[in-house]
Amino acid sequence: MRSIIKRRRPGILQGAGYALRYVRALFLGVGCKIFLGEFPRPGVLLRNGLAHEAERLAQLLQAGCRVPEVWWQEQNLLVLEYVGPDLAHLIRKEDSTSRLWLTRAAAADMAAFHARGLWHGGAQIRNLTLQDGEIWRIDFEENIGATLSRPLAQAYDLFQMLASLVSLRKLDDGDARTLGKLALEVYLESNPDPEVKACLMRLARVLCAIAMPLRPLLRRFPSRDVQGFFRVADILQPLISKS
């Protein structure tokens, strides 16, 4: 049977590494407070890693979610059930019809997941897989959702999925925007939670305000991340217009 082996090697400069990660988490928290109104506590953000992932997987399995089983666990090592190829790989290689189906399935599954009051925390499209015609979720090391309100944690999940989807390699600009718009539409139709939408609108205002002055300078910059940022800002912009 196939499995996924995840290892973390303890660093020689572990104390210094923790200090740097704490400073980074602190800056993230301050930025989140300024722009989105919530302060994710750095100490909670840093309670992540393989042990945290094993705990979350056990909780989600108990709740009946489609996530991998933990087959073996020891310090700095997890052996997980293999739950199919990731959607990033599938979307890159499939035809347009299959891409649309996969995008709809991913958005609808996230909406159903959120409707149960759950959050992922690492909801990039590469962390969704397809097995037996159903969407599964992997990679639960990140702990940001534990220190945000439920609506903001879920809005952040959706942002992660959209941003990663529209930044995929082998998608031209038109296809990327089509898939991103479809994912947003399907999600909001399936989970019309006003609190999540309000958080998404706040996030959209921040992204659009940042994108406006940068666009003339970086419009032709050949970076998937930069162009993906502009695409997701454009996809979310109508939320502001309707508010």
What are these regions (language model features)?
Residues 140-243:
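C-lobe/activation-segment region of protein kinase-like
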Residues 50-66, 88-126, 131, 135, ...:
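Conserved kinase catalytic-core helix
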Residues 69-73:
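Short beta-strand
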Residues 2-6, 79, 137:
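Short hydrophobic-acidic sequence motifs that mark active-site Asp/Glu residues
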Residues 8, 83, 141:
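Anionic group-transfer/hydrolysis microenvironments
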Residues 12, 87, 145-147:
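Conserved protein kinase catalytic core
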Residues 75-87:
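Conserved short submotifs of the Hanks-type protein kinase catalytic core
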Residues 1-48:
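ATP-binding glycine-rich loop module of kinase domains
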